[in-house]
């Protein structure tokens, strides 16, 4: 399955998240992420095969903290997640050398609710009628712009996936161009064994239909979890496939810009099934020397130069490096309790090769990852150099022994929690407003055991202890000081609400009560296992490790999830200060 060295050389949890939401880290001027009121980014199209929208996309609205923390009258500005938010407006600032080549300016416009454009043709050509060739079957998934159906070729009986994009949802000329470009790129990359194959594109009066091969073998992480074990050698094989796809894209002038494990699916459940790269909704064509400014991607995987709004194809190598780091350790290299914190870590954080399981990982593997995650894109390894690295080569030095079992456990939690949040994100519509504050008030009361209206350090310690957080006193004190804006020595109700609302803003202003009510179908005030299973079934998500989710989220062990526990889960990025604990 792997690629050889060939090709062109193109140069824990619970209340921890509730409190640490108030951590607004200082930034040095040259490393800060400049905010823009109207800028944000999102994935334009739903997953092309399984119909899942990607969650947790990067937006460019990241506000650095001041050097001191005055008492604000309103919550800090939000960091919005891109897959449900409007695309970025054009970048007008240009601080480059005027003699340098112009930067790519994608004319994204803020999406407004409308009946859509009067579109004569998206594809620019007359096509056959989809239903004359295919029988359209059950829905596989629903996305922001399109719905994915199973379709069957009437002549051969072969199954495919068909993504149908309603024209009325294409509200700007840029939306139309995005659809055209994605189809063009899929055709451009057609023939590569590890790129999803487009079969055809069709258009009628109301929609565009993109027919492609169906990938029914599940996501990359899920396959690893199902097998129960894998070796460093297998990780190297997967790395070759991932980087080989990137090299092929770059050699054809395509930058993916949204590489992450969820965008790699297996064609079938067979042991030797091909791994395919999917979803080119954020991909663009690029020319040598061309730079881009729009902030796109997903938080854990986004490259630092993307956050700084000056990047090119090297950003894909960084994302691949993050994926390989996760394949070897089970956790992402840069994480925090908030998305802004994740961005800070991407820009400045240190790589951890000390914690388990890294002592048992080969030095060659660590060398490769380290060189793929160099922040200076010009010093970062190229795809060709990665494929030629001793660890990544087909006959390379990757160890043929099982990786630490903790890796599998961490991958399982990481994958499962993301999927549940995906469902919740899909069903959120309008603002929680009053309902959201009511939920936070109950959370505050739960920690403020003496009902004084202030959370003391001792109450915070006990609250964290109740949910099993394993933190040093110095770390808890650090959280306390970060949330205590007026330096009173306690966290008052206003500070707590400000911190929590800020975190909800980071979650795309998620209206959590709406999502909770979706799961709580009988209105009991609790989400049961059966309700979770039914919701997952409705969204086509099988084997989502429901028992693991309940164990992680159900803090009082009553076998169900109440609203407070649900809020904790939604605000948890998955990794506490000490990493995921494995029993």
Curated annotation (Swiss-Prot):
Segments of skewed composition (Pro residues): 67-79
Lipidation positions, renumbered (N-myristoyl glycine): 2
GO MF assignments: ATP binding; calcium ion binding; protein serine kinase activity; protein serine/threonine kinase activity
Membrane topology: Lipid-anchor
Bias kind Polar residues: ranges: 51-62
Keywords on record: ATP-binding, Calcium, Kinase, Lipoprotein, Membrane, Metal-binding, Myristate, Nucleotide-binding, Phosphoprotein, Repeat, Serine/threonine-protein kinase, Transferase
Amino-acid positions noted as binding ATP in the UniProt annotation, renumbered to this chain: 140-148, 163
UniProt function note: May play a role in signal transduction pathways that involve calcium as a second messenger.
Protein name: Calcium-dependent protein kinase 20
Source organism: Arabidopsis thaliana
């Amino acid at each position: 399955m792997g690629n050889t060295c060939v090709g062109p050389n193109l140069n824990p949890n619970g209340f921890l998240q509730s409190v640490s939401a108030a951590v607004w880290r200082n930034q040095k001027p040259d490393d800060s992420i400049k905010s823009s009121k109207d800028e944000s980014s999102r994935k334009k199209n739903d997953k092309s095969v399984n119909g899942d929208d990607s969650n947790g996309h990067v937006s460019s609205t990241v506000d650095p903290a001041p050097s001191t923390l005055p008492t604000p009258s309103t919550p800090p500005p939000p960091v919005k997640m891109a897959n449900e938010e409007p695309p970025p407006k054009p970048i007008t600032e240009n601080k480059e050398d005027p003699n340098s080549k112009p930067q790519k300016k994608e004319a994204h416009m803020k999406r407004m609710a409308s009946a859509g454009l009067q579109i004569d043709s998206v594809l620019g050509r007359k096509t056959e009628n989809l239903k004359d060739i295919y029988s359209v079957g059950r829905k596989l998934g629903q996305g922001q712009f399109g719905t994915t159906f199973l379709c069957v070729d009437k002549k051969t009986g072969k199954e495919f996936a068909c993504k149908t994009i309603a024209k009325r949802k294409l509200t700007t000329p840029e939306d139309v161009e995005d659809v055209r470009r994605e189809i063009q790129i899929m055709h451009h990359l057609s023939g590569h064994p590890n790129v999803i194959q487009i079969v055809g594109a069709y258009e009628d009066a109301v929609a565009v239909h993109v027919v492609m091969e169906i990938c029914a073998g599940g996501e990359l992480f899920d396959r690893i979890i199902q097998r129960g074990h894998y070796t460093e050698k297998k990780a190297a094989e997967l790395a070759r496939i991932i980087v080989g796809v990137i090299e092929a894209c770059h050699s054809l002038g395509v930058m993916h810009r949204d590489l992450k494990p969820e965008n790699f699916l297996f064609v079938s459940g067979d042991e030797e099934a091909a791994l395919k790269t999917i979803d080119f909704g954020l991909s663009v064509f690029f020319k040598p020397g061309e730079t881009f400014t729009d902030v796109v991607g997903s938080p854990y995987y986004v490259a630092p130069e993307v956050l700084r709004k000056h990047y090119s194809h090297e950003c894909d190598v960084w994302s691949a490096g993050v994926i390989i780091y996760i394949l070897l350790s089970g956790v992402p290299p840069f994480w925090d309790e908030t998305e802004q914190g994740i961005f800070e870590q991407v820009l400045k954080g240190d790589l951890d090769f000390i914690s388990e399981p890294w002592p048992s990982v080969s030095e060659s593997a660590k060398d490769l990852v380290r060189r793929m995650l160099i922040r200076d894109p010009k010093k970062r390894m190229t795809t060709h150099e990665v494929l030629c690295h001793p660890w990544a080569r087909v006959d390379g030095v990757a160890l043929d022994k099982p990786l630490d079992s903790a890796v599998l456990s961490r991958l399982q939690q990481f994958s499962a929690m993301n999927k549940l949040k995906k469902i919740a994100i899909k069903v959120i519509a309008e603002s929680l407003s009053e309902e959201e504050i009511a939920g936070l008030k109950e959370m505050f009361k739960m920690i403020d055991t003496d009902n004084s209206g202030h959370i003391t350090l001792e109450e915070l310690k006990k609250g964290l202890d109740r949910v099993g957080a394993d933190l040093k006193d110095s770390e808890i004190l650090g959280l306390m000081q970060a949330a205590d804006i007026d330096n009173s020595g306690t966290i008052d109700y206003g500070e707590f609400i400000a911190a929590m609302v800020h975190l909800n803003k980071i979650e795309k202003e998620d209206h959590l009560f709406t999502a909770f009510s979706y799961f709580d179908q009988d209105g009991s005030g609790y989400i049961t296992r059966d309700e979770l299973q039914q919701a997952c079934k409705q969204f086509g998500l099988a084997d989502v490790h429901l028992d693991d989710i309940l164990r992680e989220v159900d803090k009082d062990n009553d076998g169900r999830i109440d609203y407070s526990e649900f809020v904790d889960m939604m605000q948890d990025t998955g990794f506490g200060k000490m990493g995921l604990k494995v029993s």
